[in-house]
Design a protein with these regions (language model features):
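C-terminal domain-boundary segment and adjacent tail
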Residues: 65-146
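Active-site-adjacent pocket scaffolds in enzyme catalytic domains
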Residues: 2-83
């Protein structure tokens, strides 16, 4: 906020091996920091709640792990319930020829599993739905909050 940012999309409301804030809100919101509600909007990554736990599905390792048909089904179900889905990938996740770091086995699996299939899966999902930018989505959210 102090840097002039209007929104942030860095919170992942899931507990993972490497990161995550499992009890973070799962909808677009104004975060509280030191008891003060920020003007900045937080746009958390999309999750599916199963058995009381948040599970990622639409980006990073989860996107590469789950089959495309399942991701599409979750996105459709969310749309019917009025929920948005953020689909995101890091550049290294769509470049099977990219340089690989020498990592411990578990971290290597998480970082590189199914990188070779990510581009085709992403193309299929992009053909199946209409997407917008986070900027356009939050413009709608701000209008609805007022």
């Amino acid at each position: 906020e102090e840097l002039g940012l209007h929104y942030d999309a860095s919170i992942f409301p899931v507990k993972t091996f490497l990161y995550g804030i499992p009890d973070a809100p799962t909808e677009i919101h104004h975060p509280l920091v030191n008891g003060r509600e920020l003007a900045l909007l937080e746009v958390p990554m999309s999750v599916l709640k199963i058995g009381g736990k948040n599970i990622g599905y639409s980006g990073g390792f989860y996107f590469r792990l789950f089959p495309g048909w399942l991701i599409k089904r979750i996105i459709r179900s969310g749309h019917r319930s009025g929920r948005h889905s953020i689909v995101y990938l890091h550049p290294r996740e769509v470049d099977p020829a990219g340089r690989r770091l020498d990592l411990p086995l578990l971290e290597s699996f998480i970082q590189y599993y199914n990188v070779a299939g990510a581009q085709a899966k992403l193309a299929g999902i992009l053909r199946s739905f209409q997407f917008t930018s986070i900027r356009k989505k939050i413009t709608c959210e701000i209008s609805e909050m007022q």
